[in-house]
From Swiss-Prot:
It comes from Rhizobium etli (strain ATCC 51251 / DSM 11541 / JCM 21823 / NBRC 15573 / CFN 42). This is Tetraacyldisaccharide 4'-kinase. It is an enzyme of class 2 (transferase). Pathway: Glycolipid biosynthesis; lipid IV(A) biosynthesis; lipid IV(A) from (3R)-3-hydroxytetradecanoyl-[acyl-carrier-protein] and UDP-N-acetyl-alpha-D-glucosamine: step 6/6. PANTHER family: TETRAACYLDISACCHARIDE 4'-KINASE, TETRAACYLDISACCHARIDE 4'-KINASE, MITOCHONDRIAL-RELATED. Keywords: ATP-binding, Kinase, Lipid A biosynthesis, Lipid biosynthesis, Lipid metabolism, Nucleotide-binding, Transferase.
Amino acid sequence: MISEAPPFWWRKADWRAWLLAPLSFLYGRIAGHRMAHARRASVSVPVICVGNFTVGGAGKTPTALTLARAAKAKGLKPGFLSRGYGGSLDVTTVVDPLHHRAVAVGDEPLLLAQEALTVISRRRLDGARRLVAEGADLIIMDDGFQSARLAIDYALLVIDATRGLGNGHIVPAGPVRAPIRQQLRSATALLKVGGGNAADGIVRMAARAAKPYFTASLKVRGDDRLSGIKVLAFAGIADPAKFFRTVESRGAEIAVAKTFGDHEHLTEEEIDDILTTAERQDLLIVTTSKDFVRLSGHHGKAEQLAQKARVIEVDIVFEDHLAPGLIIDRAIIACRDRRLKELKTS
């Protein structure tokens, strides 16, 4: 998986995109063939995949959290399935947020584990089976739409309304993971997050393909306003600009903005620079939930930064508040149909 998306991916296609187009054609053929012909193994519970069309953040993790809360409201025991990207463990593991650190299991699984049972596994089928063994009656898979070898009952593709598909090219010329038409064929529905019109084209394509789509927005949790406060904002996520816009929407004045690589663990020197700059300029330090969990469990400067930083937490809020429950219900029905079909053909 590519963790660092070149900036030109998110602008109108230029000479770099066209230069890489032959490689994109080859990559797209391979990715499309895998999606169309991959054998997907089955588990006994519904599987919802929260994915996206492109490399980088679109809001998958907060969407997965929203779906888990909807599942729990229905009396279900959801379980999250993740590859544990950014973590060092390469064995199937139940994530314990009280004992594991992001360096071992990845930052996103640590966030997910605070909400529900979470398993990381390089082989998603093994992870899904472990979740079932642990009592999960619904699996929410964070990413893996294009590559997982696991039967999916409901594939919800999240797209950011501000970034859309970027320059529209497939990796490495652009951020798109596989041919769009192939992705749409395999998708159940789309979720457009935020304002802007960059996603309008793909939404129209989805409508022509008879795929439903939902809309949602990112909402800052709580009533914590930052009006008139000067801050140092730092983020090591796929789209730090989105975080900075969120901070400014709370009324803060960003005096210093620092960006790091997605899933990147800060060095002692980087942490010291943040602390020193904030103290020298009398700035409040603000960061994301993912950056915060990467600091958690450490000592020294990292612990000091974790104590000083204010975390700006965001939730995905569906425009139709019944939509998350509807998605859960549709996944359950699809799972029943899948299981009946398997019984008839066995």
